[in-house]
């Protein structure tokens, strides 16, 4: 049996890919999820967490984009699609999942950027999340 850490990491990887596909194609998110269920080894991931990320992000998209806006050096529209997907996952975790330490969210996001992003996107992601995590988790410290 795989560890929760590994299956959750894989769920984040799949979530980046699913969000990227959704952002590019504009297909219904449930169609994207069904495509992943057919074409990926979905049993090797934390499926519940994958669904929570995808559904939670798409249902709270405007809120999450607005939440990240003050920490960006450019507009959301100017972000690359991969960076946008990673940041949406990160801000979802920072805002909704207080059981996940913010340092874990930052580390996982950096690793996702190294895996999927442009050459230096991990540095951009790290800078955004360093600023945001201090503010977001401080403002919600009663939830930590």
Swiss-Prot record:
GO terms for cellular component: cytosol. Coiled coil: none annotated. GO terms for molecular function: RNA binding. SUPFAM superfamilies: NusB-like (SSF48013). InterPro entries: NusB-like_sf (IPR035926), NusB_fam (IPR011605), NusB_RsmB_TIM44 (IPR006027). The keyword Transcription regulation applies. Pfam families: NusB (PF01029). GO terms for biological process: DNA-templated transcription termination; transcription antitermination. The keyword Transcription regulation applies. Keywords: RNA-binding, Transcription, Transcription antitermination, Transcription regulation. Signal peptide: none annotated. Belongs to the NusB family. Involved in transcription antitermination. Required for transcription of ribosomal RNA (rRNA) genes. Binds specifically to the boxA antiterminator sequence of the ribosomal RNA (rrn) operons. This is Transcription antitermination protein NusB. It comes from Buchnera aphidicola subsp. Baizongia pistaciae (strain Bp).
């Amino acid at each position: 049996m795989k560890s929760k850490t590994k299956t959750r990491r894989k769920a984040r990887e799949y979530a980046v890919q699913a969000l990227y596909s959704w952002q590019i194609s504009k297909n219904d998110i449930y169609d994207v999820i069904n495509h992943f269920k057919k074409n990926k080894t979905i049993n090797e991931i934390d499926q519940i967490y994958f669904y929570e990320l995808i559904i939670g992000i798409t249902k709270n998209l405007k809120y999450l984009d607005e939440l990240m806006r003050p920490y960006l050096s450019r507009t959301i529209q100017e972000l690359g699609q991969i960076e946008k997907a990673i940041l949406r996952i990160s801000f979802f975790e920072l805002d909704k999942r207080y059981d996940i330490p913010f340092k874990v969210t930052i580390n996982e996001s950096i690793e996702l950027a190294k895996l999927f992003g442009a050459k230096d996107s991990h540095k951009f992601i790290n800078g955004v999340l360093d600023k945001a995590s201090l503010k977001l988790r401080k403002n919600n410290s009663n939830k930590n």
